[in-house]
Amino acid sequence: MLEKSFVPADHENALYDAWEKSGAFRAHPDQPGEPFSIMFPPPNVTGTLHLGHSLNFVLQDMLIRWKRQEGFNVLWQPGTDHAGIATQMVVERALDKEGTSRTALGREGFLERVWDWKQEYGGTIVKQLRKLGASADWERERFTMDDGLSRAVRKVFVTLYNEGLIYRDRRLVNWDPKFRSAISDLEVENHETKGSMWYIRYPLEDGRTITVATTRPETMLGDVAVAVHPEDERYADMIGKTVILPLTGRRIPVVADLHSDPEKGTGAVKITPAHDFNDFEVGKRHDLPAPTVLDETACLWIEEIRPELRDVEGLASVAFVETLNGLSREEGRKQVVAELERLEWLEKIEPHKLQVPHAERGGAIVEPRLTLQWYCDAKTLSGPAVEAVESGKIAFEPRQWENTFHAWMRDIQPWCISRQLWWGHRIPAWYGADGKVYVAENEQDAQVQAGEGVSLTQDEDVLDTWFSSALWPFTTLGWPDRTEELARYYPTSVLVTGFDIIFFWVARMMMMGLHFMDDVPFRTVLIHGLVRDEKGQKMSKSKGNGLDPLDLVAEFGADATRLAICAGTGPGRDIKLGRKRVEEHRAFVTKLWNAARFLEMNGAKPTEDFDPASVKSALGRWILTEANDAITEAGRALSVYRFDEYASCCYRFVWSRFCDWFVEFSKPVFAAENEETAELRAVSAHVLGLILRLMQPVIPFVTATLWQELGYPGKFEEIRWPEIMTVTRADEARAELDWVIRLIGDVRTVRSEMNIPPSQKAPLLLRDAAPENLERAKTWAEAIGRMARVSDVGVVGEDAPRNAAQLVLDEATVFIPLEGLIDLDAERARLAKEITRIEGEILKVTRKLDNADFVARAKPEVVEENHDRLATFQSDLERLKAALGRLA
């Protein structure tokens, strides 16, 4: 006997452990079956589960579970990412609390501590994913720095280097002065900041001045030119002239370049190639030098400009510039501005809002910095990836993301793959005393290249975390070895990921997969949105609207959490999720449990010899027909990644068709104990089994519990996706039950609109009903009476009864006499008053939405909320007017 209620905590852990021990999630590359494989987007080893992870992994798990049911040979490859800078930061913080540091330990000692930390805490997110029900093949779990992947990374690096696709170059990078390392664009967050725009006059040699506007006066020490637009008439005769740079006395040219915008500032801009990405490009176009004036800690540094410093009375002072050396950029800025003001070269200061780049990890202000780094020729590697998308070898879902992919790929830059960290894949390059580089998979091979007696020192840098991640689809399957798994599961079937890493990860996996495997890494890229709160706002700690998925699992169960995520996931849109949504979906789980319990109490038991084609009763044939529709629609929805439509289809069939109608219609039959009773018991048990199989991908715990407890045959984790059944006279059964359901539903609506008390039964009169519908009303009189609170069903001629509400159902007019049930005059007055109130609300909201100023200034979620309110009010108004019309 089923328990009174389903308590997820009583079942989830035991079920999951049993599945894992039985090998239910294990891949079998040596067995038949069409392969279907998905690779984990490897979460950071430092990570803990958040709602973004939950969305991503629930969608993957649903596809994996569904494909297992369909008989595919499935691999869901799990693993975690070493997360270079994130992990190093976590361990450095721990060391700081202990009163020591990375440098105090030394490289080897520090790396030992990181591995210890990984061993102790690195499995947290994996354990949490198990709590969510993720059915990955955990025995195959990989780590981006395990021995096999490390060997593969070294081989890829050496191969690309030998092909000329990896090289060293001096270029601008995003520099984190706290970690003293280059970082990727994805690790940079722009914060809007209130700052200043300084207008500084630069004197020309001929005595004139040109005013430049800048937000970074301290970097003027590294200026190498002033740029103006070639068509800006104000400066036409200055192009080619020489400017004497204030403070330093250095001579720099005025150049013509399209980078300058005549409409912004003064139209003249200072060019500092070593400290601005746009200026770097201007410098290349004009063959300008690029002196660095900020060191690795973002302090002023004058070594590269010192030889050119000179004193110019009233303009420049070598002694002053020397005092700036070693100052922080902020203090240096103050000193530079003060000196310019003292010398009267500062024209004015204006308040200015600007986007300041901050490091995602640690929060330091990021600097563009010119450094010698290792680069990968992404432009060359990108060609086959672009062709793969254009030819349809790889499809994006939704298709709109292909445009984003192409936009990024059109402007692809060399990929900086080196990082000045200790935790990560150390670059397999060694240097002789003369600086000559030897690239090899190990030091022994490098020594062979260098020759005996040459002392070698390995490069101190490590590879960008995204480099090893780009190899994930094939290295996790054993490459460079020719493994059974690699032959069976590559290319993978679908990649599920967020839009923010299409370039950083997705595109790079395409490049590497095509280059080393000569095939795409996946056939489909499924892009999902972000998880937002119920009002559509981004979740954040500062807003206090964040949700911990494990808290949701603990309170509502993994099934309810998964179902809420699934139901909210539509193509190309963010998902709104809150506690209320999850609670609503827990109600669904409860509804399913209660229905199963009711059927069990009424003798419904699964039978292996049940034949749907032999069912005689209209009710039985109808629910089997509805089940066929649900199976078809659910399968179609999953096949096109419409998780929201899958959830909606299941919800509609289970909650409405099965629980609200079929179970309710069945109650008197179960009580009667006749031939139809036995048939309906068999039908209900069979359909419940179909529901459990249909919904296993999204709510695996409650479905598995019911399958086991109710005695369905076979292991639940091995069951197949339900097949379409043969149902005799299906259309006839559908027409009959649909008519009865619409009649009951319409009568319920009228009763609600008329405020008829539930305790008061009302007669029902039909006029002009077709003979088959009169027969249906007679056959289903008990159900109509019980479910629509109807005292009896009769027929009326041409004379309509007075004071009756009326509705139209197909060819028939249905009357509900109201005399004695309600105070008709009072009800008319109530409806009229409510109509007036609703019309007033509609007017207020309409005025607000018609106000262009409101729409422009209000937050998008506020505008959306008002549109929703307007739609609700308009719906209410239609309903109220219909009710009043029925009383007229």
Swiss-Prot record:
Could you tell me the superkingdom of the organism this chain comes from?
Bacteria
- Name the family: Belongs to the class-I aminoacyl-tRNA synthetase family. ValS type 1 subfamily.
**Quaternary assembly:** Monomer.
Keywords associated with the record: Aminoacyl-tRNA synthetase, ATP-binding, Coiled coil, Cytoplasm, Ligase, Nucleotide-binding, Protein biosynthesis
Checking PROSITE patterns in the record gives: AA_TRNA_LIGASE_I
Q: Which organism is it from?
A: Gluconobacter oxydans (strain 621H)
The cross-references to CDD domains, in alphabetical order and at most eight, read:
Anticodon_Ia_Val, ValRS_core
The short sequence motif called 'KMSKS' region sits at 538-542
Q: Which molecular function term from Gene Ontology is one that the record holds?
A: ATP binding
Which PANTHER family did the record assign? VALINE--TRNA LIGASE, CHLOROPLASTIC_MITOCHONDRIAL 2 (PTHR11946:SF93), VALYL-TRNA SYNTHETASES (PTHR11946)
Q: Tell me the gene name.
A: valS
UniProt protein name: Valine--tRNA ligase
InterPro entries documented for this protein: aa-tRNA-synth_I_CS, aa-tRNA-synth_Ia, Anticodon_Ia_Val, M/V/L/I-tRNA-synth_anticd-bd, Rossmann-like_a/b/a_fold, tRNA-bd_arm, tRNAsynth_Ia_anticodon-bd, Val-tRNA_synth_C_sf
Report the EC code(s) recorded for this entry: 6.1.1.9
